[in-house]
Amino acid sequence: MGHLLRRTDLPHRQIVNEKGWVSHDLNEIYRNTVQTVKTLVAESGVAPETIAGIGISNQRETTAIWDKATGKPLEEAIVWQCGRASGIAQEIAEQGHAEEIREATGLQLSAYFPAAKMAWLLRNGGEERQKRAADGELCLGTIDSWLVYKLTGDHAFKTDFSNASRTQLFNLKTLAWDEKICEMFGIPVCALARVCDSDAVYGTTTMEGLFSEPVPICGVLGDSHAALFGQGCLKPGMIKATYGTGSSLMMNIGDKPIQSSHGVVTSLAWGRGGKVDYVLEGNLNYTGAVITWLKDDLKLISSAKETEGLAGEANPADRTYLVPAFTGLGAPYWDEKATASISGITRTTGTVSYTHLRAHETSQDL
């Protein structure tokens, strides 16, 4: 069992426009990735030549498009929280495909997942972009595939089973891109990444010259799946809860998929040694992100650390609560039209009350 020597991080911008669309700068994410590794090596005192391998754990569902030949992004990435593609998901639902998609992919039809986001990126670029995608000139992928592409010398375009299963384009039974569903969304299969075991070797990297010899990228997992693995939930019935920007309640269900009738979704946990495991998961769109809202938009706090003291000052009898549906409601409701609301406000409600708002979606569903 290894132990943690050091950790480092760099924030990247949360780009929100006047429509509430949330985007990320792909080049900024790549630059920050390289810089954090360089800082980590420098501060830990580890000799670069002793590093045996690199793993990637990424935010899921955030969707990117870039030129396969040049690596140049065509647009900013659409963040998992962003609901700009909800109209496309609604179109597919009105065509009567929602249940068929859920049966094949394990996922409720929603703009939360990359399929609708990819369709939006193609439509937004017009016929020329759609033709280039069909001709195999463009890459449509999630953040893991973007980082693998940028880090590897041969520009490998690969993803793992956990990330592929969250696109709403991957068939959980055939373990392949579902051509029929791809066609529904207008996504050419040739624009999607090659799907590999989570513990496969994805290529090698020098991390822009940091390593004198290339180091293998030998593990890729979506962040929630990596948390499940890291918490040792390797057997059916084992469960973990992750609280971050959003939240995830995930249970290992073993080597056969189970479809829930209660609003949670089925995904692949990972692929290891040629075998896969499955999970059931409930996702909440906004939990920790509420702190960012309190800080950046309401200006009620200047740092996340202040919330602990303010929570201690709050009146326990205050019944003010928040439904943080800033981008709709996740599991088990999957209501993309829902909006955030604050209830229970009285004359005594003040700043302390607002920063101690009970996150109703979180407390009720987790």
Spans of features found by a protein language model:
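A glycine- and small-aliphatic-rich helix-loop capping segment at beta-alpha/alpha-beta transitions
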Residues: 2, 66-76, 234, 254-263
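Short, conserved phosphate/pyrophosphate- and ester-handling motifs at nucleotide-, phospho-/glycolipid
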Residues: 25, 82, 223
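A generic structural motif
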Residues: 10-13, 80, 264
